[in-house]
Amino acid sequence: MMIIWLTGQPGSGKTTLANSLINDIKAKNDIKIINLDGDDLRSINKNKDYSKEGRIKNISTAISIMRFLCNKGYLCVVSIVAPYQFLRDELKTEFPFLEVYLHTSEIRGRENFFAKDYEIPNDTKCLSIDTGKLTIKESTNEILNVYRKMATVA
């Protein structure tokens, strides 16, 4: 199937946009779709390790789950910080992949979880959205427009 990976610092709107995106896609399509959220994954794994090694372990687990679900025909909407580019790149050659970088200058109450080692996406195909300037609906529509183009090609 396909992966839509929403990445960005904590508080940039990943979970909010993932929920909005899933609701819009479900409303118009009969498709198997799932959200893999970083907070949910950490809760399931009981992984509260925010060191580099802990983050790599958590994201590697997410990648294994995404690979499994995509092979079962699911559209995976991923809302995980995933600070390291090499991890975000891992599935790009296996499945249709839309990377969405969410950023904002607004402080939204999670500054204590700021990932100091976050690597801003360097892929020219990555969609970049400033969630401080666009509404949830506008941001969702930006992602949906690219998703629809990719879905017709895939």
Question: Where are the predicted features?
Answer:
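Conserved lysine of the Walker
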Residues: 14
